[in-house]
């Protein structure tokens, strides 16, 4: 959780990956709210896969997702694909953060990134203990599991073709191809 992070590490990660002046200029060009307000960034989580920052400008909060400092091959395209999928889920009943803007121009932050609404929460994968009531109440954990299943079921009902998601891969024979990867 944020309050457990080392503040010096947060500052180093933010300084090296989020140029606040360039980000603010880009946000202004995109017409995002808070023009003229100071942009602040706080490291949330990341590592080898992708980095996540909380971005604040005035009363507005977003999450910025970007590749790590050393951008692996293909990662910029992955960011664009993630943005495309989240954007396609707009107005669906699938729980997801609304995306606000994407930047594929490396001169802004050195890699492709996107901004989405900030959602307060926690990751059961990256936390050593879960917040209450999930840490001690098995009924709450059970309810959380059912919410996860419900979200996956909702996602499975999305008409991905009608939402413009063709071209993300080969849907035919997907499961059969996975067996060879095991």
Located regions from the model:
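ATP-binding pocket architecture of kinase catalytic cores
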Residues: 38-181
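Juxta-kinase regulatory segment immediately upstream of eukaryotic protein kinase catalytic domains
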Residues: 2-34
């Amino acid at each position: 959780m944020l309050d457990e992070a080392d503040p010096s590490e947060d500052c180093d990660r933010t300084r090296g990956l989020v140029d606040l002046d360039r980000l603010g200029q880009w946000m202004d060009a995109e017409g995002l709210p808070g023009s003229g307000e100071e942009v602040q960034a706080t490291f949330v989580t990341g590592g080898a896969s992708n980095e996540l920052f909380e971005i604040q400008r005035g009363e507005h909060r977003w999450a910025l997702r970007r590749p790590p400092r050393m951008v692996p091959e293909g990662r910029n395209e992955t960011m664009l694909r993630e943005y495309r999928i989240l954007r396609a889920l707009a107005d669906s009943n699938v729980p997801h953060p609304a995306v606000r803007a994407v930047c594929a121009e490396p001169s802004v932050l050195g890699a492709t990134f996107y901004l989405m609404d900030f959602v307060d929460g926690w990751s059961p994968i990256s936390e050593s203990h879960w917040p209450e009531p999930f840490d001690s109440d098995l009924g709450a954990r059970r309810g959380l599991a059912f919410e996860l299943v419900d979200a996956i079921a909702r996602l499975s009902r999305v008409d991905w073709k009608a939402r413009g998601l063709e071209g993300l891969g080969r849907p035919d024979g997907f499961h059969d191809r996975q067996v060879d990867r095991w």
